[in-house]
Regions:
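Short, low-complexity Pro/Thr/Gly
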Residues: 1-435
Length: 435
């Protein structure tokens, strides 16, 4: 223990609501947390999380990895938008797939992501009208697990009564629960809380920090942020070009997944259908296999057989990646460029089983195309792509074996990851621009 420093835990309730308030997708469908400027304190984001009691209707069954939030919005005390992540539910599934199978197994009881355990045996547990306590890890670069530094909320102005305002928008019922009969199923959140760990320093330490700020110093807080781009695949052709316009000074990673353009709630869900790709709103398409509602693996015909990224006159990689005879090269390329090619293989690289056979999850439902523009692992240095330099779009050229819209209309969901810095300045002001 460092002299003059102590840790304590507190919980922040949604603004203007009591602890037993019920949030649903149609009424009270936004959670707002106003993070106070705690005196002499820093937030330890690694030890902080959102918790709530997740309830279903009597005929509702949670999808194997329920994502109750579709959008995350984080503002400073002066209203500046620091993070705005639309389709954060899809981003959450994407990063869950990049965890190891062992991690997902260990977290299943808290997160209700049961995909790494026996899904069929847990089917009955995913309907609970009395509720299940669920932990949600924020997909936030500032207040989530991605933040590697303590967040100095005590040094931020709170003239409005808070240092940050966090807004979470609830997802539609169809993407959180399926129906075990032919009637619509619903879900709700109760007992919602943002459990936070604070690191509190002494008055003497805080006085030294305030003195440095008063003399013109500033506190840099690096953080990641993500931007969502969704583009529909149009026409009946097998070649599609996706242009993404994003002005980022330090663009590090890109992730693209292929998904249905729309989703309707699945009905008459059983423990067998529960496993099917077509019953999971967060299945990613582009691979060569699918687990059907009957429990059998089927061959897909509309798989991706070639792709390449392009920015300006430069291709990434230098020549298109041809996926022959399967999608293994896309998997290994994504793992290598994201520095995931080690002994702790992610969940999307494991096998999915049915009663008689196994196939790679990457082929059956977790297909993703990823690329990292980071030139080195050094932190604090601009090593990504400056896409604001020329204004040219980033293009993803896709070649399919057959028309990807033949079975159902699809879209390409792309997330742009960039690195920013929040500068905390004298008098508690903050900005993403230094000095």
């Amino acid at each position: 223990m460092i002299p003059g420093i102590k840790c304590l835990r507190t919980n922040i309730l949604p603004s203007h609501h009591s602890g037993n308030h019920q949030f649903t997708s149609t009424a009270s469908n936004k959670l707002t947390f106003q993070i106070p400027s705690f005196p002499n304190s820093y937030i330890n984001t690694k030890r902080s999380f959102i918790r709530f009691v997740l309830k279903t209707s009597a005929n509702g069954v949670l999808v194997p990895q329920a994502n109750p939030f579709r959008r995350l919005l984080l503002k400073s005390s002066r209203g500046q938008v620091l993070e705005d992540i639309d389709n954060s539910d899809k981003l959450c599934r994407l990063f869950q797939n990049m965890k190891t199978k062992q991690t997902l197994e260990a977290e299943a009881v808290s997160t209700k992501d049961i995909r790494a355990v026996d899904v069929g045996k847990n089917f009955s547990k995913m309907t609970n009208v009395s509720g299940q306590l669920t932990k949600h890890t924020l997909q936030s670069g500032i207040l989530g697990d991605w933040q590697e530094y303590l967040v100095p909320v005590s040094s931020m102005v709170a003239s409005s009564g808070y240092a940050f305002q966090l807004e979470l928008f609830l997802n539609e019922d169809a993407k959180v629960v399926g129906s075990t009969n032919t009637n619509p199923a619903t879900y709700s959140l109760e007992e919602v809380s943002f459990d936070v760990e604070l690191v509190e320093v002494s008055d003497a330490i805080m006085a030294d920090i305030n003195s440095e700020l008063a003399n013109g110093a500033q506190i840099p807080l690096p953080y990641k942020s993500w931007r969502s781009h969704q583009i529909a695949l149009s026409g009946a052709g097998t070649e599609h070009k996706i242009d993404i316009s994003e002005s980022a000074m330090n663009l590090t990673n890109m992730y693209s997944v292929i998904m249905p353009q729309s989703w309707s709630q699945k009905q008459s869900v059983t423990n067998i259908k529960y496993l099917a790709k077509e019953f999971d709103p967060y299945s990613f398409y582009g691979g060569r296999k699918a687990l059907s509602a009957s429990g059998a693996f089927t061959d897909a015909t509309d798989y991706v057989n070639k792709y390449v990224w392009r920015y300006g006159c430069t291709y990434y990689p230098q020549s298109p990646i041809e996926l022959v005879p399967d999608s293994t090269l896309a998997l290994e390329t994504s793992l290598a460029t994201l520095d995931l090619k080690n002994n702790e293989r992610p969940f999307m690289a494991t096998l999915e089983d049915n009663a008689t056979e196994s196939h790679p999850r990457f082929e059956s439902r977790d297909f993703v195309l990823a690329h990292s523009f980071r030139k080195s692992g050094d932190k604090g240095i601009v090593l990504g792509l400056n896409s604001a330099n020329s204004g040219a779009p980033i293009s993803l050229q896709l070649h399919f074996n057959s028309n990807p819209n033949a079975s159902l209309p699809k879209s390409v969901q792309t997330f742009i990851e960039q690195e920013n810095t929040l500068y905390i300045k004298p008098n508690g002001e903050s900005s993403t621009v230094a000095n």
